Amino acid sequence: MSTNTKFIYHRILLKISGEVLQGVNKFGIDINSLKRIVKEIKLVLQFGIQVGLVIGSGNLFRGATLSQLGVNRIVSDHIGILSTIINSLAMKDIMNSYSIPSYVMSSIPVDGICETYNYERAIDLLSNNFVVIFAAGTGNPLFTTDSAACLRGIEIKSDIILKGTKVDGVYSKDPKKYSQAVFYKRLTYKDVIQKELKVMDLSAFSLARDHNLPIRVFNINKPKSLYRIVKGYDEGTLIK
């Protein structure tokens, strides 16, 4: 394996939104999207970068959306939590097909399917070059997978949270709706709060801020974007 001395990050926590997995579909998992992401991850693994992964559930069921439709919010969030396990298992299976050693750890017990999360075990797996996929969010309703990503990032002592989305970074407004939206290359934690930018929910963002954990938001669909970030290129938006 090649040395990673020329890379600025040694251990990363990659957060991928569920919407990224659905690709061109309106619902579900697009296998081609999964394969593309796995190839991006495999590229950085070849240089010794350790990768923890959290996947959202928006391609299947989002708790907040179900709640708006009349489903009890706690039940809605439980459905979202289970959906992250589905996404995580699909990701692991594609990783297996690319000969990438990976492990799914769930915040809730799912005996016979995946191991229950333990941070010491997770760090040991990462140190042995396994991709650790953290499923089931925080294990509790009312918390997003962004909160789970920041929490796991802190626990495993990751160097940075990399939030892979379908846009190039953080904008003043939704760039798909507003052509005049301003793109931000760098922001402070204070900037994000003052400008009320939708980077993450406040609980997740506060976790990262309080532990001085930098966040970079980038377009995971851009080829080699993940590689460029760990190499030190100024891809997307950096928040610190």
Curated annotation (Swiss-Prot):
Q: Which residues bind ATP?
A: 15-18, 58, 62, 165, 171, 174
The protein's location, in the record's own words, is: Cytoplasm
Gene3D superfamilies recorded for this chain? Acetylglutamate kinase-like (3.40.1160.10)
- Can you quote a single GO CC term? cytosol
Q: Which domain of life is it from?
A: Bacteria
The pathway where this protein functions is: Pyrimidine metabolism; CTP biosynthesis via de novo pathway; UDP from UMP (UMPK route): step 1/1
Control of this protein's activity is summarized as:
Inhibited by UTP.
Question: GO molecular-function annotation terms?
Answer: ATP binding; UMP kinase activity
| GO-annotated biological processes | 'de novo' CTP biosynthetic process; UDP biosynthetic process
Could you tell me the keywords of this UniProt record?
A: ATP-binding, Cytoplasm, Kinase, Nucleotide-binding, Pyrimidine biosynthesis, Transferase
User: What EC number(s) does the entry state?
Assistant: 2.7.4.22
Q: How does it assemble?
A: Homohexamer.
Which HAMAP family does the entry link to?
PyrH_B
Q: What is this protein called?
A: Uridylate kinase
Q: Which organism is it from?
A: Buchnera aphidicola subsp. Schizaphis graminum (strain Sg)
